[in-house]
Amino acid sequence: MPKTYDQAYFDKWYRDPAHAVGAPAALRRKVALAVAQAEYYLGRPLRNVLDVGCGEAPWRAPLRALRPGVDYRGLDASQYVVARYGRSRNIGLARFGQLEHLRFDTRFDLIVCSDVLHYLKPAEIRAGLAGIAGMAEGVAFLEVFTSRDGVDGDLEGFHARAPEWYLRAFADAGLLPCGSHCYLAPRLGRRIAALELARLPAGTAR
C-alpha cells in the first residue's frame, strides 16, 4: 500500500516528540549553510528558491528570516499539503519525476530537495535530476542519506543505496559536488577552482 502524506503523517514525524527528528535550530543552521553556498558561488544575494518535496514548507520561514525578500516556491506530491498550504505558502502539486518536463519562467538561485530522494525509485530520481540541472542557476541542496549513514526517522520505503549510486546520478545530470549536500549548477562549472569540488578530477593519479 503506498504511503500517504496526510496530516497524520506530518503530525507524527514533525510534531510528535516521540518521533520527530531534527530541531528547529538545526534546520536554521542548514538553511544558513545552503544560502551561504548559493550566494558565494553566485556572487550576489539570493533572489529565489525552489523547494522540491517541501512538505509543509519548514524551510520557508527560516529562509525569509535570513532573506526577507526571497521568492519562495514549493512543490510537493501531497494532496493534503497543497490543499492546506498551497496558497498561503506558495506550494504547487508535483512529483519529483515531473521536474524532467516542468519549467518556470525563471531559473532558481537555490533548489532544495531535503530528505526525499532516498524514498524514490531510480527512474524518478534520474528524471527529476535532469529538471533540477536545467532549472538551477546556482546551487542545489540535495540532502540524501545512504547505506553508510545511520538513519533516524521514517524508514518506510527507505532505499539504502550506496553513496556512489547518488554521486553517479548527480554527475550524469551535470551537477557538481561542492560539499555538505550542495551541488553546483552545470553552468557554474567553468567558474570554480578544481579543489572546490568534493571529488577527484577525472584522470587523477592515486
Model-derived segments and their meaning:
Residues 1-104, 120-206:
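Class I (Rossmann-like) S-adenosyl-L-methionine-dependent methyltransferase catalytic domain
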Residues 115-119:
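Short catalytic micro-motifs in class I SAM-dependent methyltransferases
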